[in-house]
């Protein structure tokens, strides 16, 4: 477990690291009153963007990832459009490296937006409980879902 105070303290450093990630096209740290959110847009393929949010799960007291997939298109008149994609598990696994991670779809109770959520039940077992550098250990594992070479960037 990671306290909310430690999460908020460590997240700005993580935002700096993630901004160096070659797949990240946009990185924004949103400082809310109680907790902070890191928003990352990343190009996965030419016409596919992943909108990723790292936030704090107050129930489990660990960081959490939610994401959405956006497909981009150009029509005959070069007008661009984007649509939200909802894929089967097999299709999703062909785009991102879920490996042993489980993902579910659910809606945000406040905004009613639908997101994929990475299951965070085993977070402490995966990254340990020592608060120092907790988020660094966490992103080096959990962001590999989106880029298996990410841990090299963090060394």
From Swiss-Prot:
It is an enzyme of class 2 (transferase). The active site is at 121 (glycyl thioester intermediate). The keyword Signal does not apply. GO terms for molecular function: Atg12 transferase activity. Pfam families: Autophagy_act_C. Its EC number is 2.3.2.-. It is found in: Preautophagosomal structure membrane. One of its GO terms (cellular component) is phagophore assembly site membrane. Signal peptide: none annotated. Keywords: Autophagy, Membrane, Protein transport, Transferase, Transport, Ubl conjugation pathway. InterPro entries: Atg10, Atg3/Atg10. It is a peripheral membrane protein. The keyword Aminoacyl-tRNA synthetase does not apply. GO terms for biological process: autophagy; protein transport. Belongs to the ATG10 family. E2-like enzyme required for the cytoplasm to vacuole transport (Cvt), autophagy and nucleophagy. Acts as an E2-like enzyme that catalyzes the conjugation of ATG12 to ATG5. ATG12 conjugation to ATG5 is required for proper localization of ATG8 to the preautophagosomal structure (PAS). Likely serves as an ATG5-recognition molecule. Forms homooligomers. This is Ubiquitin-like-conjugating enzyme ATG10. It comes from Kluyveromyces lactis (strain ATCC 8585 / CBS 2359 / DSM 70799 / NBRC 1267 / NRRL Y-1140 / WM37) (Yeast). The gene is ATG10.
């Amino acid at each position: 477990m990671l306290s909310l105070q430690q999460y908020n303290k460590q997240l700005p450093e993580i935002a700096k690291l993630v901004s160096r990630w070659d797949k990240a096209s946009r990185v924004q740290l949103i400082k809310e009153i109680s907790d902070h959110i890191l928003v990352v847009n990343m190009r996965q393929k030419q016409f596919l963007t992943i909108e990723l949010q790292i936030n704090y799960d107050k129930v489990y007291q660990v960081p959490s990832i939610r994401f959405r997939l956006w497909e981009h298109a150009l029509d005959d008149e070069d007008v661009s459009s984007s649509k939200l994609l909802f894929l089967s598990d097999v299709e999703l696994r062909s785009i991102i490296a879920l490996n042993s991670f489980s993902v579910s779809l659910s809606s945000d109770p406040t905004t009613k937006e639908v997101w994929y959520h990475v299951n965070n039940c085993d977070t402490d077992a995966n990254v340990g409980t020592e608060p120092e550098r907790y988020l660094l250990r966490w992103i080096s594992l959990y962001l590999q879902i989106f880029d298996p070479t990410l841990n090299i960037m963090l060394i």
